[in-house]
Amino acid sequence: DLTWETVITKNIGLDLGFLNNRLNVSFDAYIRDTKDMLMAGKTLPGVYGASSPRMNVADLRTKGWEASITWGDSFTLASKPFNYRVMAGIGDNTSKVTKYDNPNRTLTDPYEGQQLGEIWGYVVDGYFKTDEEARNYKVDQSFVNQMINASALDNGLHAGDLKFVDLDGNNKIEQTTSANDRKDMKVIGNSLPRYNYNFGISADWYGICLLYTSDAA
């Protein structure tokens, strides 16, 4: 049975005005919990021949903050009041999965503790300076040699090839499919922007209004 998603938001804010409210500063920090998110259920085995139906299966927590500063004033231009405002703002937020039925924490599905936008990958410790250093490298990275166009034979490594880090210490570079057993992979980045910026200018004079806004991330 499907139900409505529930959103619970907690926040604390501060608004300050200076110079007869010509200069205004505001700040807001928040935590937003989304319960019973509607999304696809766990990935089904291929023999089912169909994708998992959408269900209320996940909870998500978003933490963030926003800040802005605004300057507004007016003066007389050609015997008419000229009003203007300049505003700049910045914000940041991150979201983590707090509930999802994925005890094995497979990377093909959401898992508890996952930050949205996570990018998993290998860690590289520079490159081999000499052929001798490459030949003497004790870690078998034949699995990832295709990424650097190296041969699997005798590790196929030469000076200038990338040196992958053996994170689990078993002398072999391996791929993971689960956050419970990371093998030689880890979170190396995020596809979502951290900081969002906005800027705006508005003005009106003699019945003429102008507005400019821009956003960036």
What are the residue ranges of the model-derived segments?
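Extended amphipathic secondary-structure runs
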Residues: 186-211
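Outer-membrane beta-barrel proteins
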Residues: 16-20, 33, 69-77, 84-86, ...
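Flexible, solvent-exposed coil segments and beta strand-coil junctions
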Residues: 41-52, 174-182
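Outer-membrane beta-barrel signature, preferentially recognizing the C-terminal barrel domain
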Residues: 1-24, 52-79, 115-130, 190-195
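Residue-level detector of the transmembrane beta-barrel scaffold of outer-membrane proteins
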Residues: 24-26, 66-68, 83-87, 200, ...
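Membrane-embedded beta-barrel scaffold of Gram-negative outer-membrane proteins
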Residues: 4-48, 91
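Conserved small/polar residues in nucleotide/adenosyl-binding loops
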Residues: 212-217
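Conserved small-residue
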Residues: 58, 65, 74-189
